[in-house]
């Protein structure tokens, strides 16, 4: 779906067709002797071509230090970090809050606000990826076996990805996305206020944030949150696992054949399924899940056009210019536009 959270397609199947972890390993010694053996783009490169504009826009900014004896430094955005010592056969895709290790990453493509790259047997796509947004979504691999869910973690940050609502096309034909940033910030503000007035020394943290009601509205995989909670070791210390409800371990649905995968994606993109998911996401299907009252608003923020998101949600289609159907899109702003779905996918 256009504007969705990353769609991760796993090349699973029989042993002869499954992507093998051995296909992704590389040797640090080989890397030192022959850089071409590492199928990674260098920092600031897109498919092997250095593009200064893309480096500035997507990959980082250059800052000049106020100290006279210090040179200008580049603040990294998205790039690849090669290990400096022979103690780790891994490469890290770096940016504030994002890290993929230790898989072989290649074919990085930046197009508009979309970032796509191949990660082992996965195709990872970030849509509506805009640098100024505060908040990150990442895929972290802790092992070399891409088929082992225990070694693959999809990391959620409180914003903006956990609050994604959907995409539409504005009057200029540009794709826009609806985000409920206010909802997450309201949760944080409420927790901070409670902590400030509390007689205890407890501090509100991201781990105490409730799960956003639409965090998984567009996720085709399912989530096992219990597998990603912190556990207490015998010494009384908590291990390094993060127990934030925004950090989830994603277990892709098992796919036995490409036919099953094709059918599953067709079912996912079925208009009726999309309407149902959107109704649930916007809270317009009389769901039993409570919606924060403080987030409700009916302020139009975009001009009308021939098709509108409300008519799609209500089953009226995208072409009813004279339709008077209206759907309450609380707790987000009411918008007008066409819901766009991209049926193209790769595996």
UniProtKB/Swiss-Prot annotation:
Residues 282-302 are annotated as: Disordered. Residues 282-300 have a biased composition (Polar residues). Belongs to the adhesin P1 family. Pfam families: Adhesin_P1_C. It comes from the Bacteria. This is Putative adhesin P1-like protein MPN_099. The lineage of its organism: Bacteria, Bacillati, Mycoplasmatota, Mycoplasmoidales, Mycoplasmoidaceae.
